[in-house]
Amino acid sequence: MPGAAEALPTVTVTLVAGAVPPASGALTAHCIGGFWREVGVASDQSLVLTAPKRVEGLFLTLSGSNLTVKVAYNSSGSCEIEKIVGSEIDSTGKFAFPGHREIHVLDTDYEGYAILRVSLMWRGRNFRVLKYFTRSLEDKDRLGFWKFRELTADTGLYLAARPGRCAELLKEELI
């Protein structure tokens, strides 16, 4: 359907990372906070993979049960920044954001990678996207990548991120 990709609301505005480490039982700012670079996206909805704005990186800050997400986008070669605040909901590692969006952390080691499920309702349809993030600007975390591939084996549509200037600027806190 022509123009559909432009009409799809940006799913990736609310990406977050962090789950409860098995030993601690509580989400803490030092575990979740900081820089994350988007490395992979998997969805069975092609519109999600062709969005005009592409997330390159996130900077997360946890304060109580609120999570502030600073998102760096690449929009036709220009960097855009957006901040959004979500709240932890019924289970640790699951957050709700404005616009009927939820993020659930499926797997993370906090130091290298995080795998998230983003869910949202748009035009009466449920969309689900799996996202793979690393702390590094390079693709160093192969264990996280293989876990992402295992979780998304039945999805069918993948998009691997390219290194981007916006993620670099966000990591250096220049934007």
Swiss-Prot record:
Record-level GO cellular component terms: extracellular region
Glycosylation sites (chain numbering): 66, 74
Highest taxon of the lineage: Eukaryota
The keyword Disulfide bond appears for this protein: yes
MF terms (GO), sorted A to Z: small molecule binding
CDD domains membership: lipocalin_5_8-like
Keyword check for Transport: yes
Leader peptide range in chain numbering: 1-25
Disulphide-bonded residues: 79-166
Compartment(s) where it occurs, according to its Swiss-Prot or TrEMBL record: Secreted
This protein's UniProt keywords: Disulfide bond, Glycoprotein, Secreted, Signal, Transport
InterPro entries: Calycin (IPR012674), Lipocalin (IPR002345), Lipocln_cytosolic_FA-bd_dom (IPR000566)
GO biological process per UniProt: response to hormone
PANTHER family named among the record's database cross-references: EPIDIDYMAL-SPECIFIC LIPOCALIN-8, LIPOCALIN
Main function: May play a role in male fertility. May act as a retinoid carrier protein within the epididymis.
Record-given protein name: Epididymal-specific lipocalin-8
Native organism: Homo sapiens (Human)
Gene: LCN8
